Amino acid sequence: MNALTPHIGPHIGESDRLRLAPGVMLRNDRRRGEWMLMAPERLLVLDEMALAVVRACVGPEVADVAAGIDRLTAEYDAPRAEVAADVLEMLTDLRNKGYVVT
């Protein structure tokens, strides 16, 4: 499997450590005012919430997904169980589309 091949597998868990897949970059298109995940021959425009999830849960500086969920729970003053369910679903989708890897 390469970076462009989607990985369909089990859901992302709170103990997982995620990083952007090889060849994927988080970029800000200042002209359009949009953040996006760019990969070879494809891109995904992120809304405000998706950007917050990627920043909180993906990258070498993030201990694990649980730490990102805790950060988002505090930042948005929302019930942790709801935040966790939404975040894990979004991250699993991003992984299945080949944008993030464990």
Where are these regions (language model features)?
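Long, charge-rich, low-complexity alpha-helical segments
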Residues: 2, 42-102
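Acidic, low-complexity/disordered tracts enriched in E/D and polar residues
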Residues: 1-55
